[in-house]
Amino acid sequence: KETAAAKFERQHIDSNPSSVSSSNYCNQMMKSRNLTQGRCKPVNTFVHESLADVQAVCSQKNVACKNGQTNCYQSYSTMSITDCRETGSSKYPNCAYKTTQAKKHIIVACEGNPYVPVHYDASV
């Protein structure tokens, strides 16, 4: 079974994007990372930093998660990210996404030993 940490990595880490500048990036990535199996995942963020840099956020600024839990952490520095958002015309199995690039602080929920990201909470 896929661990929560491995799932986070599959869903959110793309350290060396080949074609992030392309408007097709989200359509390709959401499919290749299995985020369109059974349904179209409505929103997803990919972080273009090393896994080590993203894991390090778990020892940075402690903040409350959207759901009120206290195990979320905000990155001290901005990170290069791409937001993928389902378009109005998207219909499973032909999931369609809008690709938006940004540089933002990321907020992740961390748990376990080692203490690693298991959920992507927000970007600010």
From Swiss-Prot:
Its main location: secreted. It is found in: Secreted. Substrate binds at K7, R10, K41, P42, V43, N44, T45, K66, R85. Its EC number is 4.6.1.18. Glycans are attached at N34. It catalyses: an [RNA] containing cytidine + H2O = an [RNA]-3'-cytidine-3'-phosphate + a 5'-hydroxy-ribonucleotide-3'-[RNA]; an [RNA] containing uridine + H2O = an [RNA]-3'-uridine-3'-phosphate + a 5'-hydroxy-ribonucleotide-3'-[RNA]. The active site is at H12, H119. Residues 15-24 have a biased composition (Low complexity). Residues 1-13 have a biased composition (Basic and acidic residues). This is Ribonuclease pancreatic. The gene is RNASE1.
